[in-house]
């Protein structure tokens, strides 16, 4: 999905910055997973992976720290996108929808 993105979507990925550390990117498309499903657990947002790859299969639940929620950008992908580091740390989460 993500690696076949049109140029405007690739630029969007490249321009995303971590909400709690705006000098640092959310990382790249390789660190991005679709998470079109979510739940709320005790007031905390939990993203559910819907395009599993590598070590993170479909259905994996990832708690999203509030300070990693990205609300200040649109989202041209049509999917919830979560950026996850090699050790499982969440860099950013962008909710589905938006333009």
Enumerate the language-model features and the residues they cover.
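C-terminal partner/receptor-binding element of secreted or periplasmic proteins
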Residues: 75-99
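A generic structural signal for short, solvent-exposed coil/turn residues
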Residues: 18, 39, 74-75, 86
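Short, conserved turn/kink motifs that form compact alpha/beta structural patches or helix kinks used as
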Residues: 66-73, 81
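Short, small-residue-biased leader/transition segments that mark boundaries at the very start
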Residues: 1-2
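Intrinsically disordered, low-complexity regions enriched in Ser/Pro/Gly/Gln/His and often acidic
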Residues: 5-6, 64
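Short, intrinsically disordered, charge-biased short linear motifs at domain edges
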Residues: 6-17
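Intrinsically disordered, low-complexity segments enriched in small/polar residues
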Residues: 11, 43, 89-91
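Mature extracytoplasmic domains of secretory-pathway proteins
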Residues: 17-68
């Amino acid at each position: 999905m993500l690696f076949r993105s049109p140029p405007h979507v690739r630029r969007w990925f490249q321009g995303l910055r971590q909400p709690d550390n705006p000098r640092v990117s959310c990382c790249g498309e390789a660190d991005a997973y679709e998470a079109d499903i979510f739940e709320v657990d005790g007031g905390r947002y939990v993203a559910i992976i819907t395009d599993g790859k590598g070590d993170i299969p479909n259905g994996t639940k990832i708690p999203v720290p509030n300070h990693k929620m990205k609300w200040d950008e649109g989202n041209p992908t049509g999917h919830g996108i979560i950026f996850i580091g090699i050790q499982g740390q969440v860099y950013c989460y962008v909710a589905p929808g938006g333009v």
